[in-house]
Structure formats: structure tokens, C-alpha cells
A protein has these predicted regions:
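C-terminal motif of bacterial Sec signal peptides marking the signal peptidase cleavage site
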Residues: 20-21
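Short, Lys/Arg- and Gly-enriched loop/turn segments at beta-strand edges
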Residues: 95-106, 141-151, 251-261, 350-352
Length: 373
């Protein structure tokens, strides 16, 4: 039985993440002073999309050791401190903790219990307080290895039974696939178990997890998505996009990890094409602006990420946020904003496997109407 299966059996949705906080002796904070200018960019006062990174932004270069990685959002002392306006150059591990390397490796045999989705961080953002927002502009995500892996774990997937979704019939066997990365062609290749069939996928790296400490001092496992971010498995958390996360605790305690090289909508088998990433992100702080659920932006699109169960509640969370955003930007009535979003938004199912499901609602910003005389 895999660690993911054990986790799903261990607690109902409402109780997931209510684990004891790690002590300071377990996760000692690192000094972590960014290189470069002592005075970083001042906190921003409005949540406008980040279009470029200042050339003189201070840089924190940090390669975490394996023992530096964390497996919860909240409950871990910060490993680094940064000022707003800092560029972070670092690395992060895959969801299997780097332990699964070949098709013969089974996660249940190779992974220590509780070591799903290791995170790089937490980063303490100086000046961040509850009610603020951290803006994480993803500058660069690149495969850090020449291979990636995917796996099916019994009891973990959209089309098998578990303690929350009962089904008759036997489960599928635990199975691993290894993907070879062709960096020159930007593809990943795999073969069927009997070797008779081969396929390849375009590589489009993204973070499976990115988040801050949850509200109320809660500690959440890195399996779970929520309003704090977490294990959203959203392909839009990629280079060129900016992720906005509401601050719930002093310093925000930003973490990211669970590198993905590719993934289909729904992540229906329970894992993407998983691999370690070389990372460059730029972190800003927006004071006195709350962000109730994760928002993603680029030059052309606005996106909201909703998580919950049942699936329709995840969609409702994201649609509600989108309607409120359109109303604020356009100054249309609530009903007109509702109608506009109803006819224009796209809503792909992001994942159907975690304790909370995730739906992305996205909209072309250029379609939002402006008032006429």
C-alpha cells in the first residue's frame, strides 16, 4: 500500500492537515540574506500583473539539501528570509522525493512514509502580514534531470475506489513509467510495459505545488490544495505567469515544489510526468490587498483556482471569484458580470485525485467590456 493510499485512508477531508506543527529544532531557520543591494524593491500597492523583473533586483541563490525539503504547508520554520522584490534562483524535487528512478521502482517500496511532494522553502517574506498578497512571478522552470517518472498507486486515481469514493471491482496494480527527456526537442518519451508501443509528450514544466502557510495556524500536508494554494497541480503555474497568494501568517511562508514536466487535464491516474526543476522566481509583496483564493495572471488572461469536493463546489469557488473580479474591473452590475462570465469563461478540470478536487476558471482579459458614454 502506497504512502498516498495510506494518507487518503488516514483522515476525512475536514480533518486533513490537522497535524502537529514541526518544532524549531526540527526545521532550523537559515540565515538566508539575499545577495546584491541591501534595499529591495518596495512593496507594491496594487495587484497589477508583473511583466518584467528589474535588472537590479537582489538575488538569493540557494540549492537546498534533501534534509532542507519540507512536506507540509505551515508548521515548518522558514529556511530563508527574503525582502520583497527578490529574485530566487533555486531547485526543487519531484513528487516522489527523488526516490523513483526506473520503471522497476515502485513508490510504495522506495519512498519514506509522508514524503510525498517535497517543497523548497518556506521563504519568509519580510513585511508580509495577514491581509496582504504575495505575487510570485515565475521567470524560469527547466528540467533538472534527463528523465522523469509517472506512476499509478493503488487507491489513488480518478477511476478507482478509495475511502471517499466506493467502487466495486479490483484495483489496478502499482505501476511506474520512466520518461526520457530530449532537451533538444523539448519532449519526453516513454514506452508501454511490453515495449511494443512508444509515445512522446511536449515538455511544459510547472509547479504541482505552490502555496503559503494556511490560516489559523493550520498545518496541511502537501497532498492537499486549498485557498492557501498547495497541491493544485495546475499547468498554468508555469514560466511567464504570476501567481497571487493571500497571506495568512507573518512572513507568508512561501513554498513550492512537485515539479511536473507535462500533465493532461484531470491528472486522472494520480501523477503527472514528474521531475525535478531548476527554478527562478521573482517575489513581490502587495500590502493591504487580500487574495481569498489563488489567482494567476499573464498579459492576456486572468485565472482563478478553486479547490473543493464535490467537483462542482471547486468550480463554484473559482467562478464566484471570477465574477467578483470582472465586476470590480468593469463596474458592471453583478448580474451583468455573471452573464459575461457565463458566456466567456473556460473551466478545465485540473485534477480529480486529491482530497480536494481543483478547477481552473480562465478568461481573456481583453474581452472585458468598458463603459461607453
Amino acid at each position: 500500500m502506497t504512502t498516498r493510499r495510506k494518507f487518503l485512508l488516514s483522515a476525512p477531508i475536514g480533518a486533513i492537515g490537522a497535524v502537529a506543527a514541526c518544532s524549531g529544532s526540527d526545521h532550523a531557520a537559515a540565515a538566508g540574506t539575499p545577495a546584491g543591494s541591501a534595499d529591495a524593491v518596495a512593496p507594491r500597492s496594487s495587484p497589477t500583473p508583473i511583466t518584467s523583473v528589474p535588472a537590479d533586483a537582489p538575488v538569493l541563490s540557494w540549492t537546498p539539501k534533501h534534509e532542507d525539503l519540507v512536506y507540509t504547508f505551515g508548521g515548518a520554520a522558514p529556511k530563508q528570509r527574503i525582502k520583497p522584490g527578490t529574485r530566487i534562483v533555486t531547485w526543487t524535487e519531484d513528487c516522489f522525493d527523488g526516490a523513483v528512478k526506473t520503471a522497476a521502482d515502485l513508490p510504495s517500496k522506495k519512498m519514506p512514509p509522508g514524503h510525498d511532494n517535497p517543497q523548497t522553502g518556506p521563504f519568509y517574506v519580510e513585511g508580509a502580514e495577514p491581509g496582504d498578497t504575495v505575487a510570485v512571478h515565475i521567470v524560469k522552470l527547466e528540467p533538472a534531470r534527463s528523465y522523469a517518472v509517472s506512476a499509478f498507486s493503488p487507491g489513488f486515481g480518478a477511476l478507482v475506489g478509495n475511502d471517499q469514493t466506493a467502487m466495486l471491482g479490483p484495483d489496478f496494480p502499482e505501476t511506474t513509467w520512466r520518461y526520457e527527456v530530449d532537451a533538444a526537442r523539448n519532449v519526453a518519451r516513454a514506452s508501454s510495459a511490453d515495449g511494443k508501443h512508444k509515445w512522446e509528450l511536449p515538455i511544459s514544466p510547472f509547479f504541482g505545488c505552490i502555496g503559503v502557510a494556511p490560516a489559523g495556524g493550520e498545518v496541511r500536508t502537501t497532498i492537499v490544495p486549498g485557498n492557501f494554494g498547495g497541491n493544485m497541480d495546475c499547468p498554468e503555474v508555469r514560466a511567464g505567469n504570476t501567481v497571487y497568494l493571500g497571506v495568512n501568517a507573518p512572513g507568508a511562508l512561501l513554498s513550492f515544489g512537485d515539479g511536473h514536466y507535462a500533465m493532461g487535464d484531470g491528472e486522472i491516474m494520480g501523477a503527472a510526468v514528474e521531475g525535478a526543476l531548476n527554478v527562478e522566481v521573482y517575489v513581490e509583496l502587495i500590502k493591504n490587498v487580500a487574495t481569498p483564493i489563488p489567482r494567476i495572471e499573464n498579459a492576456g488572461e486572468i485565472m482563478f483556482v478553486g479547490s473543493g469536493r464535490p467537483l462542482e463546489d471547486a468550480a463554484r469557488v473559482a467562478f464566484k471569484a471570477m465574477i467578483e473580479w470582472v465586476r470590480a474591473k468593469s463596474h458592471m452590475s453583478e448580474m451583468d458580470s455573471y452573464q459575461f462570465v457565463s458566456q466567456n469563461a473556460k473551466a478545465p478540470i485540473i485534477q480529480l485525485v486529491d482530497p480536494q478536487y481543483t478547477v481552473l476558471v480562465k478568461l481573456d482579459k481583453h474581452r472585458i467590456p468598458t463603459a461607453t458614454q
